[in-house]
């Protein structure tokens, strides 16, 4: 969609999320105070009802077991080719505040050297209630940006292909690896001053920290050691290839 001559889009890869969850995600994009187009990418399990909605729908013929990275990257590459003025990501289980895109653009306007924005999250329970005492470990407090919090300007587009080329064995850490790539490659992001991303919290430890029973399906926080063991197992030639595919210079390090 056009906003003052600019066109923005949101990319959402999806897998087997139910209709209610996808609808919540899609409705939040449709409500943005700055008009945006929404591109959904089915990772092997397309839902036909989406074709009746005012969104774009890309279908991958099989699932890729990479936490949505390929779908995210393919959607982004299409948006780059179609010359959108800004690209954001939103996973199917999360949703935006109505002013999310507006706040990202405002942060970038205030920080003209930045070529991408970092939004902030609020953690929410499966019933939609917020977890206000939890401060996600991300900018401006910690060195991390969640996938749902990226907003890219065209000068950063040349890095987006790494979502497609990142090895599947590293995909669970994709958002942090991409953050490290951006950190070492481009100026620091414009940080949005308030949370505008509603993040469905399925992290076991956070519920226990609050004295609550974790919901069904909750998982422990990510442990890098499994990925480091995989890196350590690679011959140097393959480790060099991983560097090309990720843009990061991994080393063999103790996994323990």
Model-derived regions, located:
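Glycine-rich, basic loop-to-helix element that forms the pyrophosphate-binding segment
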Residues: 63-79
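Short beta-strand-to-loop acidic/aromatic patch adjacent to the donor-nucleotide binding site
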Residues: 84-95
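Acidic donor-binding loop at a coil-to-helix junction in glycosyltransferase catalytic cores
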Residues: 169-178
